[in-house]
Swiss-Prot record:
EC class: lyase
Protein name: Dihydroxy-acid dehydratase
Keyword Cell wall biogenesis/degradation: no
Residues that bear N6-carboxylysine: 123
Cofactor(s) required, per the database record: [2Fe-2S] cluster; Mg(2+)
Organism in which the protein naturally occurs: Aquifex aeolicus (strain VF5)
Name of the gene encoding the protein in the UniProt record: ilvD
Length: 555
């Protein structure tokens, strides 16, 4: 069998290349084997990645056993929770592009034959997906697995419990000592945080796309089945290599439709919209944001995981995981069940072996949480290119909300205003100049949204922003407002006291001023200019596109 890597290891002209490969431990026999790239993301400062140094060893062992040469390399990672609420969050979304670029660079520079991606958290998963689609060599994903939920006084807790606990301390609901107990209990093991936050949402959707084996998104990091899954994934990769099945053969428009469908049915993180749009672009597919509303209108919400309920990823795994959700959705004909996956099975074959919905963690289609989906795209004069809301996390009485604007031009200003008591019932908190260009980096607004919940305002206050949200955000929070303020978007002309209408059932978001006043303000609007000290972030701000296009870089 001829390999792509023969370009660097075959023929007399490649003697210097082989000399260097010998220095890396390769032998004569290895020059007849495929070079299998392993993109690891081990790092000491992300709980979802601290175990990946050990986790990769049986994967490399399996590659050798099956006749390949494992070539491990690492990519960077940012822990969004640790980067949250300060200038560090400017680097989170941009890190996705660096990860994709790193994979392209290593795989193509060394002409690797196939790729194993080992991500787990937030931007690492989509960054690797983008990179894998870009290089388009046979690829399988093996995520590090989710964290076990914590427990305090018989109640499950997670990272969002800690964020919301800050507001509870401020309003006197709990003491600082009680918060410390929650803090010490919320993250008890390695793994991606235990709710349906961005990391776990993306790991689950990697299954749906067809690039990972069943169980990839839900089997816990500390579960022995995770290693079995990993070894089986390596076996699947060698089948893909033999048949020359590549990521773009698997990630089709139908696969993206199914990913959005499952995402919407399980109330995944709103960040998934941004990432799936970027993934579509790397797959050569122009995906229309408005299409997501069509999917949402026909897709029931049948699963709610923290922060939308008391259930956690371990509960979803217990009842059958993502295949069980897909099995239930297939009863309505919502999925393309003939699609092939890296497992060698079709989606239909995978779900035929899945348990039926238990009726609690995964509800039946006859008894959904709601008849439409857990994510919606809003349009209107405030968001001509669209905005995203995670409806699964919105109090039903807040689905339609009219309130008076209170405006902040940064996340820091907003947090100070919320915790300082400036935000009152009936307000719509407007946080702007936090978009991809304006931030730069489109920071997550988890600290402000958690402060609102912790201050007891979750059913009395809405929040809109051109930034984005953590998967842990809940409440009437509308993000990704496009165009952003820094690009001249209408969110920049909102004034304190203006009335804003958020109408989720009708997918509308409107600034309630006259058309004449609106046009006059837009005519006179000059976006604020920020000084960006970082040369990397300056380049990012210059090249990044709108959130409505996935916030990808375009030269």
């Amino acid at each position: 069998m001829k390999f792509r890597s023969d370009k660097v290891k075959k023929g007399i002209e490649r003697a210097p290349h082989r000399a260097l490969l010998r220095a890396c431990g390769l032998s004569d026999e290895d020059f007849d084997k495929p070079l299998i790239g392993i993109a690891n993301s081990y790092i000491d400062i992300i709980p979802g990645h601290v175990h990946l140094r050990e986790f990769v060893e049986p994967i490399k062992e399996e590659v050798r056993k099956l006749g390949g040469v494992p070539i491990e390399f690492n990519v960077i990672g940012v822990d969004d929770g640790i980067a949250m609420g300060h200038e560090g969050m400017h680097y989170s979304l941009p890190s996705r592009e660096l990860i994709a670029d790193s994979i392209e660079t290593v795989v193509n520079a060394h002409q690797l034959d196939a790729l194993i991606c080992i991500p787990n958290c937030d931007k690492i998963v989509p960054g690797m997906l983008m990179g894998a689609l870009r290089v388009n060599v046979p690829t399988v994903f093996i995520s590090g697995g989710p964290m076990l939920a914590g427990e305090v006084n018989g109640q499950k807790v997670d990272l969002i419990s800690v964020f919301e606990g800050i507001g509870k301390v401020k309003r006197g609901e709990i003491s600082e000592q009680e918060l410390k107990v929650i803090e010490a209990s919320a993250c008890p093991t390695c793994g991606s945080c235990s709710g349906m936050f961005t990391a776990n949402s993306m790991n689950c959707l990697t299954e749906v796309l067809g690039l990972a084996l069943p169980g990839n998104g839900t089997i816990l990091a500390i579960d022995p089945r995770r290693e079995i899954l990993a070894r089986n994934a390596v076996k699947a990769l060698f089948e893909l290599l033999e048949k020359d099945v590549k990521p773009r053969d698997i990630v089709t428009e139908e696969a993206l439709d199914d990913a959005f469908t499952v995402d919407i049915a399980m109330g995944g993180s709103s960040n998934t919209i941004l990432h799936l749009l970027a993934i579509a672009r790397e797959a050569g597919i122009e995906y229309n944001l408005a299409k997501i509303n069509e999917i949402s209108k026909r897709t029931p919400t049948i699963c709610k995981i923290s922060p939308a309920s008391h259930y956690h990823i371990e509960d979803l795994d217990r009842v059958g995981g993502i295949p069980t959700i897909m099995k239930e959705l297939s009863k309505l004909g919502l999925l393309h069940t003939e699609r092939k996956t890296v497992s060698g099975k079709t989606i239909g074959e995978i779900i035929s072996d899945a348990p039926d919905a238990d009726g609690e963690v995964v509800r039946t289609i006859e008894n959904p949480y709601s008849k439409d989906g857990g994510i919606a795209i809003l349009f209107g004069n405030l968001a001509p290119e669209g905005a995203v809301v995670k409806t699964a996390g919105v109090d039903p009485k807040m689905l339609t909300f009219k309130g008076k604007a209170i405006c902040f031009d940064s996340e820091e200003e907003a947090i100070e205003g919320i915790l300082g008591g400036k935000v009152k019932p009936g307000h719509v908190v407007v946080i702007r100049y936090e978009g991809p260009k304006g931030g730069p980096g489109m920071r997550e607004m988890l600290s402000p949204t958690s402060a609102i919940m912790g201050m007891g305002l979750g059913d009395k206050v809405a929040l809109i922003t051109d930034g984005r949200f953590s998967g842990g955000t809940r409440g009437a929070c509308v993000g990704h407002i496009s165009p952003e303020a820094a690009a001249g978007g209408p969110i920049g002309i909102v004034k304190d006291g203006d009335e804003i209408l958020i109408d989720i059932p009708n997918r509308r978001i409107e600034l309630l001023i006259s058309e004449e006043e609106f046009n006059e303000r837009m005519k006179n609007f000059k976006p604020k200019q920020k000084e960006i000290k970082s040369s990397w972030l300056r380049r990012y701000a210059k090249l990044v596109t709108s959130a409505s296009k996935g916030a990808i870089l375009e030269a």
